[in-house]
Structure formats: structure tokens, C-alpha cells
């Protein structure tokens, strides 16, 4: 009889333990998800690895590191550059981490994190090009390509307006296409971010950087919807930790 009572007691304890565990699991708080907009196809910041499916790059690793510091899952949302700010306005994602330059005009409409990298405008040609401009004014009468609605676009437009310089300009949706056309001879030169040019240069490269801006560096930051100061504060706090513990330096050293 005692054994039977003891057995029933142990079974009851076991059942209660299982129920208790199930209840604990069910009430576990689910992580929030940080949706990050980016234009995949902008090396070395966000682009597909050689397998054609894995997304890698500075901004990809930065977004994941920020999410980890904030205790959030990260979902990358691939978006065309010419619609990337509209997507943020509509709420398609919470922020943009896509080599976004912090500019006075953009600060009127959006919030930005503290900067995480500096950038300069530069000119790139083929190594064997007959004409290799050593300053922007030497783009005169050349076929010049750049990505639309970027600071390269703004830089060249302002230069043409200020100097009256004439050149044949071609704008592209993706920087990859700009360099493809430079390679096959449709363009004489490319105006782009120095951080982007770095991924096309080096030993065995077909390209040569012939000029780089020496003053007024640009700075990239995480772009956040105006009024979402709570997220801006969280991102800045996480970014400060990444700078302090060396994670950001490690990410940058991997690609530059």
C-alpha cells in the first residue's frame, strides 16, 4: 500500500513538473525584430557572396552586431536605392543601414545614428585608360558614370552647375552596373565613394583610382525615421559598445 501511494505521489510530481516546464516555455518573451533596409549589390557594404545567396558586407555585419547588442533579431530587407527612403517613410523597415551619408538635407527629414565610417568622393578609370583625370575638372568632355541619387550624383551636379563644365553623364540604379560599363568601354570614368572603390582596386584589378577628395569627408550613419528617438538612442548606445569593445574595428578591417 505504501509503495502504491509513493508511486502515485511520484507520478503526480512528475506531471506537475512537466506542466510547469511547459508553462515556463510558453511565457518566454519573444525577441523583437529589427527590420533593416539596404540595397544589396553595393560592395563592400552589402552584396552577395560567391554562392549567390549569402548576403555579406560591412553593413550586414554591423546590423547583426547592433541587433545582438540590443537583444533583437535582425531581418534584412533588400530595397532599390531610389526607393529606400520612401520605404522607411512607409514603415517597410525600422532603419536603413546602407552606406547612407549623413547630409544636412537628410537631417531635415530623418534621424541618424552617430557615424561609423568616413568616406570621400573619388574618380576611377581603367588602368590603361588614355585619359586619367587627376581632379574633377578634368572630367570635362568625358563620359562619366555614377549611381543615381547618391552623394556622387550631388557632387557632380554641383560641380557642373558651379563651373559650367560639360561632360556626358550617365546615371545607374546600381554601382555594379557603373563599373561593368566602365570595363567594357561605355564610360571613361566613374565617380563614386572611395569606400566602394576600394573593393574594385588592388592587385590584378582592371581599375585605377586617379583622384580622391582630400577635404570634407562624408560620414555614414544608420538612418532612422524622424521622431523615433527611442530607436536612435538604442542604436547609438549599441554602436558605442561596438566601438568600445573593438567589434566595429574588426568588421571594418575585414573589408578595408
Located regions from the model:
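Ligand-binding clefts/hinges and TM-proximal coupling segments of bilobed small-molecule sensing domains
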Residues: 23-26, 73-75, 151-170, 202-212, ...
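Flexible hinge/capping segments at coil-to-helix
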Residues: 27-28, 126-144
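Extracytoplasmic small-molecule ligand-binding "clamshell" domains
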Residues: 28-100, 171
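A ligand-binding cleft/hinge motif common to bilobed small-molecule-binding domains
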Residues: 83, 100-109, 155-158, 181-184, ...
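Alpha-to-beta junction loops
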Residues: 71-73, 89-98, 142-143, 174, ...
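Short loop->beta-strand "edge-of-pocket" segments that line small-molecule binding or catalytic clefts
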Residues: 35-38, 136-152
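Short, low-complexity disordered leader/linker segments with a strong preference
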Residues: 1-33
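Periplasmic-binding protein-like
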Residues: 40, 118-127, 194, 198-240, ...
Amino acid at each position: 500500500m505504501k509503495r502504491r501511494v509513493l508511486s502515485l505521489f511520484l507520478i503526480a510530481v512528475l506531471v506537475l513538473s512537466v506542466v510547469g516546464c511547459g508553462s515556463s516555455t510558453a511565457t518566454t518573451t519573444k525577441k523583437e525584430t529589427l527590420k533593416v533596409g539596404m540595397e544589396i549589390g553595393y560592395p563592400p557594404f552589402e552584396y552577395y557572396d560567391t554562392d549567390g545567396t549569402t548576403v555579406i558586407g560591412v553593413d550586414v555585419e554591423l546590423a547583426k552586431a547592433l541587433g545582438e547588442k540590443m537583444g533583437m533579431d535582425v531581418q534584412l530587407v533588400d530595397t532599390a536605392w531610389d526607393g529606400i527612403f520612401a520605404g522607411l517613410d512607409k514603415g517597410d523597415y525600422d532603419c536603413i543601414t546602407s552606406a547612407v551619408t549623413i547630409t544636412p538635407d537628410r537631417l531635415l527629414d530623418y534621424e541618424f545614428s552617430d557615424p561609423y565610417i568616413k568616406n570621400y568622393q573619388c574618380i576611377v578609370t581603367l588602368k590603361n585608360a588614355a585619359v586619367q583625370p587627376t581632379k574633377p575638372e578634368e572630367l570635362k568632355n568625358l563620359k562619366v558614370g555614377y549611381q543615381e541619387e547618391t552623394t556622387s550624383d550631388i557632387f557632380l551636379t554641383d560641380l557642373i552647375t558651379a563651373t559650367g563644365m560639360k561632360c556626358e553623364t550617365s546615371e545607374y540604379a546600381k554601382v555594379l552596373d557603373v563599373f561593368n560599363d566602365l570595363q567594357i568601354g561605355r564610360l571613361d570614368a566613374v565617380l563614386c565613394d572611395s569606400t566602394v572603390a576600394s573593393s574594385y582596386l588592388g592587385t590584378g584589378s582592371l581599375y585605377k583610382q586617379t583622384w580622391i577628395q582630400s577635404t570634407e569627408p562624408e560620414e555614414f550613419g544608420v538612418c532612422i525615421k524622424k521622431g523615433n528617438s527611442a530607436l536612435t538612442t538604442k542604436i547609438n548606445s549599441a554602436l558605442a559598445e561596438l566601438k568600445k569593445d573593438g567589434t566595429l574595428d574588426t568588421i571594418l578591417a575585414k573589408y578595408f
